[in-house]
C-alpha cells in the first residue's frame, strides 16, 4: 500500500459546509520580477517577526521563480499561504484572470484613486497573494500578513488589495472602498494548485 502524502486542497475543491472560510489579500506588483523569498524572510526578521517555514533546500530561497510557500507566525496557528502568479509562465492564465476580474470590479468607480488602482492592475507583472483561515488567524497573524503585504508594496512597486475592504495607499489608507462590491459579488480565490507546485 502506498504511503499517503499530505496534499493542500485548492480553495474551490471542497463545497462542504465545514469547509474553512478563507480570506485573501493581494499586492499587484509592477516590478518586472518577483524577489527571492530570502529577501522577504530577511525583511520579516528586520521587523522582529520570526517566520516559520517548511524545511527546504536553501537554494530555493534564492530563486525568483517561486510559486508558493507556507509562512507560519505561531506554532499554535495555521500558517499563511503565500502565492505568486506571473504574467508569463505556468500560471499566466491565473494572473491575467485576476487582473481582468479586479479591473472590471473597480470599473464602477470613477475617482482618481480608482484610476490609479486600475493603472497598477493593468501594469502588474505579478501578483503576490496571501491566504488565511478566517476563524484561525489572530491579531498577530493579521500583523504578520501586513508586513508581508508591505514588503511587496515597497519593494515591487505594488498596490495592496484586501478582500471585503478594497485598495490601500502606501500610507495604509483605504483609497478604493470595495466592501459593497465584495458583498454583492463572489469572492475570488485565484490561487494556483498547491498539490503540485509548493516549494516544500
Map each language-model feature to its residues.
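Acidic (Asp/Glu-rich) sequence patches and key acidic residues
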Residues: 1-200
Amino acid at each position: 500500500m502506498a504511503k499517503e502524502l499530505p496534499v493542500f486542497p485548492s480553495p474551490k475543491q471542497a463545497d462542504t459546509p465545514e469547509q474553512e472560510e478563507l480570506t485573501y489579500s493581494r499586492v499587484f506588483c509592477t516590478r518586472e520580477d518577483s524577489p527571492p523569498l530570502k529577501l522577504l524572510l530577511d525583511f520579516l526578521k528586520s521587523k522582529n517577526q520570526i517566520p516559520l517555514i517548511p524545511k527546504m533546500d536553501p537554494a530555493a530561497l534564492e530563486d525568483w521563480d517561486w510559486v508558493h510557500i507556507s509562512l507560519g507566525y505561531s506554532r499554535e496557528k495555521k500558517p499563511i499561504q503565500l502565492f505568486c502568479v506571473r504574467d508569463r509562465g505556468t500560471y499566466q492564465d491565473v494572473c491575467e484572470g485576476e487582473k481582468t476580474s479586479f479591473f472590471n470590479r473597480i470599473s464602477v468607480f470613477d475617482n482618481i484613486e480608482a484610476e490609479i488602482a486600475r493603472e497598477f492592475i493593468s501594469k502588474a507583472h505579478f501578483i503576490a497573494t496571501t491566504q488565511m483561515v478566517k476563524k484561525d488567524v489572530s491579531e498577530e497573524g493579521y500583523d504578520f500578513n501586513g508586513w508581508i503585504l508591505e514588503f511587496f508594496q515597497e519593494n515591487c512597486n505594488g498596490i495592496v488589495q484586501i478582500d471585503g475592504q478594497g485598495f490601500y495607499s502606501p500610507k495604509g489608507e483605504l483609497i478604493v472602498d470595495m466592501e459593497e462590491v465584495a458583498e454583492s459579488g463572489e469572492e475570488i480565490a485565484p490561487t494556483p494548485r498547491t498539490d503540485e507546485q509548493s516549494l516544500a
